[in-house]
């Protein structure tokens, strides 16, 4: 904006601007109006454990690390301890949530099967992965009899579920392929070594796979295969929500602010992501650009009734959820808490065309 004024008017304007800036406690870019407001000093830091569903995490899973390392958690009086699990559907991850030991990722299937917990923040509604295959695989039909990944929880885990969906496109069933369980860190090495013929990989691993072994290729993007699937949400035990709802709301607010910072502050978050993922910076930067361009991370609550209900119906169709135990949207998601957290973060917004 260009101002035209007499010299005296400009002097008054300059003094006004200086006074205004001096009154602000800090200026924060892109993490919500609430963060830029003056906060009272913390009476005490609340120690909270956060579960991350992959060890080491993929780029998409790093908002928890960003919130800790940028001091966003600290501004909300949260002292975060991060625990890495072998899959969001793993017994250890679900037990940590059930027992109120950690806030971690949970899905609709676990809730329908009896997990007494609710989702409170949708970290990444959209699927970021691609199904990567060996050079000899040209179509999904070629996966018959091949070795497919079941990392992240084995049968019922994420890679197993995605492999099942890919097989279905060729009229195949899970018994038509060999599913191989391993640690989540073994996904890319297994494909590179020829131990696997198919695996769902995150963008940074797709980049590294094609760089190290150009014959490997993407069979299908999972967002293309399942455009309405809800990918990743954090949840808390009902006992925790009942006992310390304000704490969970503060966590959700901090994480909404974090995802907004991720979209707006690439130069600050990339080093944090490199450290957390243990991946080369070029691969992390590639993944970051893909995730931002495709609006994988949320910028608001991240919740979508359409995606959640579609995921429930898909699980019923596949036999993962019994039809008579079908959960409602409100049984899966604590909508009110999400709305309260969003309001505290400054309300709804859109960043780079993303608005989930």
What are these language model-derived features?
Residues 242-323:
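Secondary-structure end/capping motifs
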Residues 15-30:
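Bacterial N-terminal signal peptides
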Residues 31-36:
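Sec/Tat signal peptide C-region and signal peptidase I cleavage site
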Residues 186-278:
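Pocket-lining segment of extracytoplasmic ligand-binding domains
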Residues 37-183, 187-190, 197-203, 218-222, ...:
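Short, glycine-/small- and polar/acidic-enriched structural segments
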Residues 1-13:
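N-terminal secretory signal peptides that target proteins for export/translocation
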């Amino acid at each position: 904006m260009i101002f035209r004024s007499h010299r005296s008017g400009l002097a008054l304007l300059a003094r006004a601007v200086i006074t205004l800036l001096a009154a602000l406690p800090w200026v924060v870019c892109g993490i919500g109006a609430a963060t830029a407001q003056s906060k009272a000093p913390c009476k005490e830091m609340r120690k909270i454990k956060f579960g991350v569903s992959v060890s080491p995490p993929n780029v998409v899973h790093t908002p928890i690390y960003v919130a800790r390392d940028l001091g966003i958690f600290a501004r909300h009086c949260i002292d975060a301890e991060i625990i890495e699990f072998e899959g969001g559907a793993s017994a250890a991850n679900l037990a940590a949530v059930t027992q109120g030991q950690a806030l971690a990722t949970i899905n609709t299937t676990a809730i329908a099967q009896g997990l007494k917990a609710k989702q409170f923040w949708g970290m990444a509604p959209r699927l970021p992965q691609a199904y990567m295959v060996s050079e000899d695989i040209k179509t999904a039909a070629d996966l018959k009899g091949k070795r497919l990944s079941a990392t992240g929880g084995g049968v019922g885990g994420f890679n197993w579920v995605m492999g099942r969906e890919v097989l279905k496109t060729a009229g195949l069933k899970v018994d038509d392929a060999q599913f191989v369980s391993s640690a989540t860190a073994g996904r890319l090495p297994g494909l590179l070594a020829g131990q696997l013929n198919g695996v769902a990989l995150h963008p940074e691993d797709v980049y590294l796979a094609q760089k190290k072994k150009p014959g490997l290729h993407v069979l299908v993007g999972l967002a293309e295969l399942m455009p309405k699937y809800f990918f990743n949400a954090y949840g808390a035990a009902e006992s925790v929500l009942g006992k310390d709802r304000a704490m969970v709301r503060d966590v959700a607010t901090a994480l909404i602010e974090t995802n907004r910072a991720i979209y707006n502050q690439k130069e600050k978050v990339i080093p944090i992501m490199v450290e957390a993922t243990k991946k080369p910076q070029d691969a992390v930067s590639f993944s970051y650009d893909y995730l931002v361009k495709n609006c994988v991370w949320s910028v608001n609550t991240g919740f979508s009734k359409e995606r959640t209900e579609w995921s429930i119906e898909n699980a019923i169709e596949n036999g993962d959820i019994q039809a008579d135990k079908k959960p409602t949207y409100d049984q899966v998601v604590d909508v009110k808490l999400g709305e309260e957290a969003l309001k505290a973060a400054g309300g709804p917004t859109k960043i780079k065309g993303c608005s989930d």
